[in-house]
Amino acid sequence: MLEIKNLYFRYSRRSPMVLDGVDLELRPGEIGIVLGKNGSGKTTLFKTIIGIHKPEIGTLNFDGTDLLKLSRRQRAEITAYVPQRIQFGAMTVYDTVLSGRISRFGLNPGKHDRFAVEQILDDMRLNDLASRNVEKLSGGEQQKVAIARALAQEPRVLIFDEPTGNLDLANEQLILSEARRLAAEKMISILISLHDLNQALALGDRFFFMKEGRIRYAGGSEMVIESVIREIFDADVRMIDADGSRIIVPVQNGAHGD
């Protein structure tokens, strides 16, 4: 289980806390959705989990292992991260995905590593692009390659920062379906930030609402209610029932009913 307790982080001693006492728990096989406005601390939290940022105070454990005591490479055997902004070198799609295996094989990939990459390319529908230069791909295609590279690490915790932002509807559904499959079949703990609240509600098992560097609310789908969304996003919404599913809709000015 991923366990974060009392996590604090700031960029300098004179700057305010960006993470201000974050507590979070996520079990194997669960999909946790981190929700909040831009600047609430979501990306900083993700970068702290994977080791880019070092917290000032707090603990960060996975299944009893203190992640803060691990090297970046050791932590890459447990955590993988797909950022919002992706940077690639001038490599093929195949080699880019294979580079995700470095935490496993070092610089000498074996047959098992190449088989794993081929399977991931197939799952992500990237076979036809395997020999293409990643820098020449569309933004959506690059996003899929970044996710495939993260999967190649065989992580126990997989973190997505707005993974569907550059994707068309078909590829968006592919990514979300893949997240569900990985959580269910491989018992990976998946942490995702999403801007689409209805997408989040349909996908998540647990929800973490962030504001000003703190997780203000955490829980299951019962936590996704109008009052919480209004407080976190400063937006007026209404929950409606549509064929047995809850849908979140914005309330237009003057559209309040009884």
In which residue ranges do the predicted regions lie?
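Conserved ABC ATPase "signature" region
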Residues: 111-129
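Conserved ABC ATPase signature
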Residues: 133-137, 141
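Catalytic Walker B motif of ABC-type/P-loop ATPase nucleotide-binding domains
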Residues: 158-162
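The feature captures the beta-strand-to-loop junction immediately N-terminal to the Walker
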Residues: 35-37
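Helix-to-loop junction immediately C-terminal to a conserved catalytic motif
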Residues: 50
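Conserved ABC transporter NBD signature motif
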Residues: 58-66
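A short, flexible loop at the N-terminus of ABC-type nucleotide-binding domains that lies
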Residues: 1-4, 8-21, 69-71
